Amino acid sequence: MSAHIIDGKAAAARVLQQVRHDVNILKAEGIEPALAVILVGNDAASEVYVRNKILRAGEAGIRSLEHRLPADSSQARLLALIAELNADNTVNGILLQLPLPAHIDENRVLQAIDPDKDVDGFHSENVGGLSQGRNVLTPCTPSGCLHLLEETCGDLSGKHAVVIGRSNIVGKPMAALLLQAHCSVTVVHSRSTDARALCQLADIVVAAVGRPRLIDASWLKRGAVVIDVGINRIEDHGRSRLVGDVDFASATEVASAITPVPGGVGPMTIAFLMKNTVTAARQQAHAQRSQPEAVCLSTY
């Protein structure tokens, strides 16, 4: 058996095509979606991620504003910038590129972002809303994974999904989205004593642990659909290359479909960042239109 390779680049292109269409509709209504990107320091990987996000925003017709702060910037300075962007009605989405320098409290600054502009979906209001099934901005990577699963499998109702990893960025929101899609969901993690056995029962496996090639064919049920979120850089015969959390070569002999690394989940993350930005712009415009006009009372 040779697995179908899920093309994340092609799927992301389709999402971005719809985003461009939605942006054009908003612009016709006088609304120009805008995304503010904040980068603290000069981490090489973060520089690449920010550059790619700004490039995709431009391609989608979304205005981008890049804010760079030195690595030694104080937390107060970062919070002041976030407050300024929160108050700016021309900014619809705020993205804070992670990781942050060690002296900055990541949770504190993420919670300072207006939930309506939190296009990463990390604010506690959006996290809580997701767990309750409300219509909120959801984390981009899990949203992209769910989209790939629905394109590949169709209706996910009744399928047994195992999420490997319990991070706030991927594992937990992924489990919540799969529950909303009516899957039976199991989350395994570093303290699970029977992770491999549980995965062997799964129709869907989402791997997000950050350990290169941890999941091989022995973890998988024949015919399972595998979404590999991991991005790990390894040395292979003297050369550096990217691999996922799944041993791709062995998994393709058992799985019915699998995402590659690179070219699988990564492009979907950026595509759904753009989708979230357009959603935020639309919702903010609707909220502004719904506000009652001020009534001026003259005194005689």
Curated annotation (Swiss-Prot):
Classification via CDD domains: NAD_bind_m-THF_DH_Cyclohyd
GO term, biological process aspect, one: methionine biosynthetic process
UniProt-annotated binding residues for NADP(+): G165, R166, S167, S190, I231
Any one GO molecular-function label of the UniProt entry: methenyltetrahydrofolate cyclohydrolase activity
Coiled coil: none
Reactions the enzyme catalyzes: (6R)-5,10-methylene-5,6,7,8-tetrahydrofolate + NADP(+) = (6R)-5,10-methenyltetrahydrofolate + NADPH; (6R)-5,10-methenyltetrahydrofolate + H2O = (6R)-10-formyltetrahydrofolate + H(+)
Pfam families in the cross-refs: THF_DHG_CYH, THF_DHG_CYH_C
EC number assigned by the record: 1.5.1.5, 3.5.4.9
Domain of life: Bacteria
UniProt key word Signal: no
Keyword terms, alphabetized: Amino-acid biosynthesis, Histidine biosynthesis, Hydrolase, Methionine biosynthesis, Multifunctional enzyme, NADP, One-carbon metabolism, Oxidoreductase, Purine biosynthesis
GO CC annotation terms, alphabetical: cytosol
Metabolic or biological pathway: One-carbon metabolism; tetrahydrofolate interconversion
Family matches, as InterPro entries: Aminoacid_DH-like_N_sf (IPR046346), NAD(P)-bd_dom_sf (IPR036291), THF_DH/CycHdrlase (IPR000672), THF_DH/CycHdrlase_cat_dom (IPR020630), THF_DH/CycHdrlase_CS (IPR020867), THF_DH/CycHdrlase_NAD-bd_dom (IPR020631)
Task of the protein: Catalyzes the oxidation of 5,10-methylenetetrahydrofolate to 5,10-methenyltetrahydrofolate and then the hydrolysis of 5,10-methenyltetrahydrofolate to 10-formyltetrahydrofolate.
SUBUNIT field: Homodimer.
Family: Belongs to the tetrahydrofolate dehydrogenase/cyclohydrolase family.
PANTHER family: C-1-TETRAHYDROFOLATE SYNTHASE, CYTOPLASMIC (PTHR48099:SF5), C-1-TETRAHYDROFOLATE SYNTHASE, CYTOPLASMIC-RELATED (PTHR48099)
Entry-linked NCBIfam families: PRK10792.1, PRK14186.1, PRK14188.1, PRK14194.1
Protein name per its UniProtKB record: Bifunctional protein FolD 2
Lineage of origin: Bacteria, Pseudomonadati, Pseudomonadota, Gammaproteobacteria, Pseudomonadales
